[in-house]
Curated annotation (Swiss-Prot):
This is 4-diphosphocytidyl-2-C-methyl-D-erythritol kinase. Pfam families: GHMP_kinases_C, GHMP_kinases_N. It catalyses: 4-CDP-2-C-methyl-D-erythritol + ATP = 4-CDP-2-C-methyl-D-erythritol 2-phosphate + ADP + H(+). The lineage of its organism: Bacteria, Pseudomonadati, Pseudomonadota, Gammaproteobacteria, Thiotrichales. Gene3D superfamilies: 3.30.230.10, GHMP kinase, C-terminal domain.
Length: 275
């Protein structure tokens, strides 16, 4: 067993380059197609393993109670799946990825926790071998364990490595939140997108986010504001973060200066690999 006292891991954000809902499954989940890539926007998790047999989680922001926290749930799932008992660890989470944004911050933290536990207890285990465990924690957790830009199907756990041309991303986040349940029950959500080939290149004429219609129907004023800024803004996940991609950093910097509403914003690079 490795002798790790305090080890730091970065936990990256993702965006969905598109997100199509195909149909509803008998288990209540939805089949989808999406293309994930990562962002150089990241949290930092520090793991201090010890002999206390206690799990302590702290953060620079207010976080969910331990039993409701995805990091804690990841530890318990790891224990159950690999029969690793008596885990003692202090975890410090420095959050930079905004919550409720569609950037996968919580899922990323859970995946990073699985990787840290693997490194300490079961270093012979590959990332790919942990994907069946990761999906039990949430549909977005597998991509963060996988650690490479990928085309995803199923509920997000069937992954095919697919690089995306590196670009800059301008992220903007309004102070708006729609619950996942509200999205999926909305009459504005199309749940019958046509299956497309994973061999396609990025084609914004046929690749979109099916959840955008729901968001725009509920917040038409913000929708109009986005279109006035640039019609190519896309929503990631179920929002409420939107992004604009460009290889021209100066273009995005100029656009940032035009934003005259109180929106959180970031200018970051896309990444194909996070490990």
């Amino acid at each position: 067993m490795a002798n790790i006292k305090a080890k730091k891991y970065y936990s990256y954000a993702k965006i969905n380059l598109f997100l199509h809902i195909l149909n509803k499954r008998t288990d209540g989940y939805h089949n989808l197609q999406t293309w994930f890539t990562f962002l150089d926007l990241k949290d930092q998790l520090t793991f201090s393993f010890n002999n206390s047999r206690e799990i302590n989680i702290s953060s620079n922001i207010s976080i969910a109670a331990k039993q409701d926290n995805l990091v804690y749930k990841a530890i318990k799932k790891f224990q159950q799946s690999y029969r690793v008992q008596d885990i003692g660890v202090d975890i410090e989470i420095k959050k930079n990825i905004p919550m409720g944004a569609g950037l996968g911050g919580g899922s990323s933290n859970a995946a990073t926790t699985l990787i840290a536990l693997r490194d300490y207890y079961l270093p012979q285990l590959s990332n790919e071998e942990m994907i069946p465990l990761a999906v039990k924690l949430g549909a977005d957790v597998p991509i963060f364990v996988y650690g490479k830009s990928a085309w995803a199907e199923g509920i997000g756990e069937i992954l095919y490595h697919k690089d995306f041309s590196p670009q800059y991303a301008l992220l903007i986040k309004p102070d708006i939140h729609i619950s996942t349940k509200e999205f999926f029950t909305s009459e504005d959500l199309i749940k019958s997108s046509v299956l497309i080939s994973k061999d396609l290149g990025f084609d914004k004429s046929i690749m979109h986010n099916d959840f955008e219609n729901v968001f725009y129907a509920k917040y038409p004023e913000f929708s109009q504001y986005l279109k006035e800024l640039d019609s190519d803004f896309r929503m990631t996940g179920t929002g409420s973060c939107f992004y604009l991609l460009s290889a021209d950093k100066n273009k995005l910097e100029q656009l940032t200066r035009k934003i005259n509403k109180p929106l959180d914003k970031w200018l970051v690079k896309t990444l194909n690999y996070v490990y």
